[in-house]
Amino acid sequence: NYRGYDVWELPPNGHGIVPLMALNILKGFDFTTRESAETLHRQMEAMKMAFADGDRYVTDPKYMKASVADLLSDRYGEARRREITGRALQPHYGDPNCGGTVYLCTADEEGNMVSYIQSNYCHFGSGVVLPGYGIAFQNRGYNFSLDEHHVNCIAPHKRTYHTIIPGFLTREGRAVGPFGVMGGFMQPQGHLQVVTNVIDFHMNPQEALDAPRWQWTGGLHFDMEPGMPLQVVEQLQNMGHDIRVLEDMSQFGRGEIIWRNEEGVLAGATEPRADGVAAAW
């Protein structure tokens, strides 16, 4: 639960838990301004922590060494939150026990809503096609680890950590709407930014998708879209983040949202970075 909204993601073995862990860390902070170094720094640090925990613990649930309940507990979120300082830190996992994706969403007048995502991974998936049918098989095994001590090590009849995560928001048991951001490991980062844009900064769905994004690429390295204030970028660099501003916006995900307001009016928004469309009939 994030500030009165329930954020729904697919459970492990997918990484839908990653944005939920980041939101669980962030809910202990108060945000007033989106484009400030303090806000972005806290979001970026929480995202790094969540990715580190996802890499450490998420795999086929039968093999996980930490439970979803522990990873999303208030106690663990608070412990991780206390690790955030005024400086950029190398990501590390905690101890809770102590591109070619397609997304669509739809809604009708009867209140039915669908959040849907599909991807074969790595463009054409495995490159193996069912003879005579042209159906390409997926390549999700790419994310298995070959380290025999890693929780996500490849094994027979085991499902790997994967990246496809359609999202959904509810409030007080009522559907608010589906959302999603395509883009491999950008997906949980996009989910985090879209959810906070809407809930913390009161953006409408289109504004939430239009806003400049950042992406963690490893270590202390972040890519940012043009449009982020230069002084904010400089402040983040002074805090220890390695920031690169890119003109190419194609790597920052592609999203769609449907939002139902308190009067029951539906609003659809589509990604300005791609060829999506919001259609009503």
Regions found by a protein language model. Give the residues of each.
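Active-site rim segments in enzyme catalytic domains, especially the processed small/beta chain
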Residues: 112-177, 201, 205
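Short Gly/Pro-enriched turn/cap motifs at secondary-structure boundaries
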Residues: 10-13, 93-97, 155-161, 246-250
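Extended C-terminal subregions enriched in glycine
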Residues: 40, 110, 158, 191, ...
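Internal maturation/activation junctions in enzymes
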Residues: 29-120, 132-133, 140, 247
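Short Pro/Gly-enriched beta-strand edge/turn motifs at strand-loop
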Residues: 84-92, 145-154, 239-242
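Extended C-terminal regions of large enzymes
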Residues: 9-17, 169-186
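Structured, charged N-terminal subsegments at the starts of enzyme catalytic cores
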Residues: 1-43
